[in-house]
Amino acid sequence: MSATLALTEQLIARASVTPDDQHCQQIMTERLAALGFECETIASHGVTNLWAVKRGADGRDGKLLAFAGHTDVVPTGPLEQWTSPPFVPAHRDGKLYGRGAADMKTSLAAFVVASEEFVAAHPGHRGAIAFLITSDEEGPATDGTVKVVELLEARGERVDYCIVGEPTSTAELGDVVKNGRRGSMSGELVVKGVQGHIAYPHLAKNPIHLLAPALAELAAEQWDAGNEYFPPTTWQVSNLHAGTGATNVIPGHADLMFNFRFSTASTVEGLQARVHAILDKHGLEYTLKWSVSGLPFLTPRGDLSNALENAIRAETGLTTELSTTGGTSDGRFIARICPQVIEFGPPNGSIHKIDEHIDVRFVDPLKNVYRRVLEQLIA
């Protein structure tokens, strides 16, 4: 069994359901400390975070390449639906099964072993290697990566490149990497009406009827046309509720929850202003609470994307696709302190599902791609 596969199994065996790290980071810290990494645990409200760094010959003047990832996994769901226990690594038909196999314990193991091999081959490496690991990526993400980033900002720590080990591949390892993500902003809208008996509508004010024209306009609005890197911004309703459940009561208010996934072609302030303008145009009496969970970020072609594309081509023969599709990731926080952030990991077809797994044939090639990137950028 390869070193990468063995470490992957060791991590899968820890039932690290968010935000419980279950000592996964301790396992990683022991390996990294043996390489000369300075390891710092940063705890916050039950969340465990790790910042580990190994300086190179150039000291703080050298380029720093960070690997960002998470040890937490999503809940298993009904255990009886799993073919084998989710936290007992199992091999079937060339695949390794277990919660976190794809998202993202294989990536964690691969970069640890890649770092071990790189340091052994390049003991005098010039640049620095760092790990930014959290147990709060699958949960609220309020005490994880963002807290470490705030600490690094306060210290004036510079991060030149960051690989986030999210499972970005689709059919084959390396066919897709993410060089950016859309922003995410949600709204909670309450439209006020006047409750009353449904037989006496002249004595009431139906908030559903009031909201409907504005809702139709919001749904039909083209917020932007996207750009070279991002598709157009989308607006979607996630929840709509009004009434008591009775058939003879006009409700006193209608509640709507919605979400924007927005590109760099739009801004938070611009989108909010346009929503308010539409609601005001329809004369609604309302309250609207906004929450922004992430801003869009984009890494244009540069040293990191070139190194990753070269490494993937050398290891797999594939020409990778740079993409910004999908949901948010912790890359949105890291982009605040790092100009080049790219996500790359194994295929994502089974993530968050019963019987999550990874094809074993991708495990060591993933490690090799990571090692090749280290060699190109900081050797």
From Swiss-Prot:
Catalytic activity: N-succinyl-(2S,6S)-2,6-diaminopimelate + H2O = (2S,6S)-2,6-diaminopimelate + succinate
Keywords linked to the UniProt accession: Amino-acid biosynthesis, Cobalt, Diaminopimelate biosynthesis, Hydrolase, Lysine biosynthesis, Metal-binding, Zinc
Pfam family, one: M20_dimer
Ligand binding (Zn(2+) 1): 70, 103, 166
InterPro entries the record matches: ArgE/DapE_CS, Bact_exopeptidase_dim_dom, DapE_proteobac, Peptidase_M20, Peptidase_M20_dimer, Peptidase_M20A
Co-factor remark: Binds 2 Zn(2+) or Co(2+) ions per subunit.
Binding locations of Zn(2+) 2: 103, 138, 352
Cofactor(s) the protein needs: Zn(2+); Co(2+)
UniProt pathway annotation: Amino-acid biosynthesis; L-lysine biosynthesis via DAP pathway; LL-2,6-diaminopimelate from (S)-tetrahydrodipicolinate (succinylase route): step 3/3
Any one biological process term the GO annotation gives: diaminopimelate biosynthetic process
PANTHER family: ACETYLORNITHINE DEACETYLASE, N-ACETYL-L-CITRULLINE DEACETYLASE
Protein name in the entry: Succinyl-diaminopimelate desuccinylase
